[in-house]
Amino acid sequence: MDLTKRFNKQLDKIQVSLIRQFDQAISEIPGVLRLTLGEPDFTTPDHVKEAAKRAIDQNQSYYTGMSGLMTLRQAASDFVREKYQLDYNPENEILVTIGATEALSATLTAILEEGDKVLLPAPAYPGYEPIVNLVGAEIVEIDTTENGFVLTPEMLEKAILEQGDKLKAVILNYPANPTGITYSREQLEALADVLRKYEVFVVCDEVYSELTYTGENHVSLGTMLRDQAIIINGLSKSHAMTGWRLGFIFAPANFTAQLIKSHQYLVTAANTMAQHAAVEALTAGKNDAEPMKKEYIQRRDYIIEKMTNLGFEIIKPDGAFYIFAKIPVGYNQDSFAFLKDFAHKKAVAFIPGAAFGQYGEGYVRLSYAASMEIIREAMKRLEEYMREA
């Protein structure tokens, strides 16, 4: 009996990611330096770890409510109010999730139906499309490569009008993976002026909100589009807590009343001990990202200088911890082939730009969430490779 033909047909649209394919292609290279990971190289702050230990010792190992601990929702409410001037009631406008990924899954499965369209500025994080596809909806990419990876009001409105009534949502990720771009208040207000004219959800993936390098705090669209915005955030990037799997949904009460249904039946509730640690992270550790940011800026600037001198075109990223660089003219523009050859010859791994959609081809993404020692050696090997190619 072969039951594989009875799986959800939408799974046929989902393939193993190019990131995983590339990782497999270089997996047998000994001692490869990986500037590939989308997670901080820092460790979770000690005081946060101690809070989790206390919770374990106090037998705080039972289910919490579906929305999460009230103390954590209050801490999250206070945190986003102080940092980003967002106003969400901890009683009924905040859901604690198993990372930002579950927050996205719960949100997109709740708002989308078969045949719906979702706009996404591209190049983009590849994790959105599989979720959208699973419910029978479709991602429509907006090419931003000719505008410094920034979505303009004109580009947005044109795309909205082209999709018509089938458009259900717009996803905005900023600071962005893979490009590192972010938006000023003025840019966001211009986008908000367009979005509020249309009955669409605005899903804001703001998981890198604590990692901005302009000297200004992150600005959330939730301050401008409260009746449309669903804000996704988490602690993975801000507090080096990727493995703790702790995220949040911030949305109006009439939204969370629906979103909690998909959240509940996906996971029941987030990890209890991790929630206690998160309370500590958002209170005593509310500024824990600051020392990390200083390190990231030094690493970013070093890489930009080295790669620019080698002919790569780079839009300076103002957030996250990625460089998205255009492969110089005269070299193989097939990003997978270019980086596979580089990895096999010099034992350094970046991520092919093609992993981030059709508009990422011809680019490479590297993460500066790695030590300066590794980064210096990687840049030295890249210089050798470019000279020898």
Per-region residue spans from a language model:
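PLP-dependent class I/II
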Residues: 1-7, 12-15, 20, 25-33, ...
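A short acidic, glycine-rich active-site loop
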Residues: 59-63
